[in-house]
Amino acid sequence: MIIPRTGIGVDVHAFAAEGEARQLWVGGLLWPGERGLAGHSDGDPVAHAAADALFSAAGIGDLGTHFGTDRPEFAGASGVTLLAEAARIVRAAGFEIGNIAVQFVANRPKFGPRREESQQVLSDAAGAPVSVTATTSDGLGFTGRGEGISAVATALVYPRLSESIG
């Protein structure tokens, strides 16, 4: 019997300092005119949480293990690139990806009008269905004060049949 595995991933980024030239990337999409997020890579909390959830589900570390700040080759990397690489690593470890679900918490950007576009970009990167939802924290905490964005993701993976026998 093949038993699926679930994982959870979390990512949080503060908005970059005023005047710092950083673009906002959320859900694999560029949000022109919005203040960017601070981070080692592009700071996309949605893509990063999705990648982290994949690693968690496969039991092979986390985002920092694979793409940490000690890895200069990932400085400025796109979240979509990191998600695609995470999916490749998880598959190389003997797993297939069932799906990924992500919820991000922020006052901005307004996500609804671009939800389908984001889901397509992330699904293409992961090679599996990715759904994204957005909410606010009703003015509470750092996201409510507009200081940054957080995201939580779950992933479902299952071992390849050939990997689970014997």
Curated annotation (Swiss-Prot):
Disulfide bond residue pairs: none
List the SUPFAM superfamilies hit by this protein, alphabetically.
IpsF-like
Where is a divalent metal cation bound in this sequence? D11, H13, H48
Reaction catalysis annotation: 4-CDP-2-C-methyl-D-erythritol 2-phosphate = 2-C-methyl-D-erythritol 2,4-cyclic diphosphate + CMP
Q: Which parts of the sequence are marked as the site Transition state stabilizer?
A: H40, T136
Q: What is its EC number?
A: 4.6.1.12
Q: Which cofactors?
A: a divalent metal cation
EC top class, in one word?
A: lyase
**Any one Gene Ontology BP term:** terpenoid biosynthetic process
Q: Record keywords: Metal-binding included?
A: yes
Q: Write out the pathway annotation from the protein's UniProt entry.
A: Isoprenoid biosynthesis; isopentenyl diphosphate biosynthesis via DXP pathway; isopentenyl diphosphate from 1-deoxy-D-xylulose 5-phosphate: step 4/6
What the record notes about the co-factor is: Binds 1 divalent metal cation per subunit.
Query: What keywords were assigned to this record?
Result: Isoprene biosynthesis, Lyase, Metal-binding
Q: Name one GO molecular function term.
A: 2-C-methyl-D-erythritol 2,4-cyclodiphosphate synthase activity
Chain positions recorded as 4-CDP-2-C-methyl-D-erythritol 2-phosphate binding sites:
D11, V12, H13, H40, S41, D62, L63, G64, T135, T136, S137, D138, F142, R145
Q: Name one Pfam family in it.
A: YgbB
Tell me the PROSITE patterns matching this sequence: ISPF
**Which family does the record assign?**
Belongs to the IspF family.
Q: Whom does it interact with, and what assembly results?
A: Homotrimer.
Q: What does this protein do?
A: Involved in the biosynthesis of isopentenyl diphosphate (IPP) and dimethylallyl diphosphate (DMAPP), two major building blocks of isoprenoid compounds. Catalyzes the conversion of 4-diphosphocytidyl-2-C-methyl-D-erythritol 2-phosphate (CDP-ME2P) to 2-C-methyl-D-erythritol 2,4-cyclodiphosphate (ME-CPP) with a corresponding release of cytidine 5-monophosphate (CMP).
Name of the protein:
2-C-methyl-D-erythritol 2,4-cyclodiphosphate synthase
List the gene name.
Answer: ispF
